[in-house]
Amino acid sequence: MTARTFDIRETRDKDLLRELLASDPVAAAYLLGDLVEPFFRQCRWLVASAGGARRLEGAVLVYTGLSVPAVLSFGAPDAVEAVLAYFARELPEMCYAKFPLEHADAFPKFFQLDYMERLWVMGLAAENLQRPTQLREALQLSKSTPIEPIIALYTDYPGNYFEPSQLESGAYFGAYAEGQLVAIAGTHVLAPAEGVAVLGNIVTKSAARQHGYATACTARLVEALAAQGCSTIALQVAADNAAAISCYRRLGFRFQEVVWQTRATRL
């Protein structure tokens, strides 16, 4: 098969980017979230189109709003590899990279990958939420919610990133048992203007697992996000976390794709 040739460039054209990403909004939820401010101004969008067409075939997002940049990819594998090759010297020297399984051949050509964490991407049309008939109570958290119990709960889960300012979005719910916070669910991406949200920071206190607390928090969160205009709800979960995957399936989430998450050093 003859290799395709691409027109490779950097773009700030949101309409072009949105057209590409909307082809799979669950898989592209993180990238769609970065089309809104203040995140958009902290992004470089490196893209490829084929055959003289204006329509994009692939994109690599370099997000510089963190102390360590993040690199994400979306689109046709050959287009993404062409973008990485063209901008090879402009890629971050060190970054967190997240890319779908189909791009796993391209990234090692340009980065040394320190580890590989396999994640499932799952998605739900908010209108298809399967709300359990027997659902525990979960409360919306706000900036007036005492912060110490939240921080204490996340202390046992160091992989989660939480800042108190995130509570201002109204996109966090908590469940309590005997007055103690035992579960919480929040968001990594909240972009009603793009119709998407990505759930995250979902944890349950070890002693309270298997009692429906996280299910309640997640269900109430999805309902709140839908009310804000987020019709597509996505999440990413460790591929070996069977308990969490089962919880999300019961709520109506379905598997979409596998992505790899890694810390990467440019070659």
Predicted regions and their residues:
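Active-site rim helix/loop that mediates acceptor-substrate recognition in acyltransferases
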Residues: 25-44, 152-178, 182
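Conserved catalytic-core motifs of GNAT/GCN5-like acyltransferases
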Residues: 114-125, 236, 249, 254-267
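A conserved beta-strand-loop-helix scaffold within acyl/acetyltransferase catalytic domains
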Residues: 63-64, 161-171, 176-203
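Conserved donor-binding loop and adjoining core beta-sheet/short helix segment
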Residues: 2-8, 19-21, 25, 29-87, ...
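Short amphipathic alpha-helix that is part of the acyltransferase structural core
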Residues: 1-29, 120, 125-160
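Conserved beta-strand-loop-alpha-helix junction that forms the acyl-donor binding cleft
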Residues: 98-104, 235-245, 261-267
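Conserved acetyl-CoA-binding loop-helix of GNAT-fold acetyltransferases
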Residues: 77-87, 204, 210-227, 232, ...
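Acyl-donor-binding surface of acyltransferase catalytic domains
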Residues: 51-52, 63-135
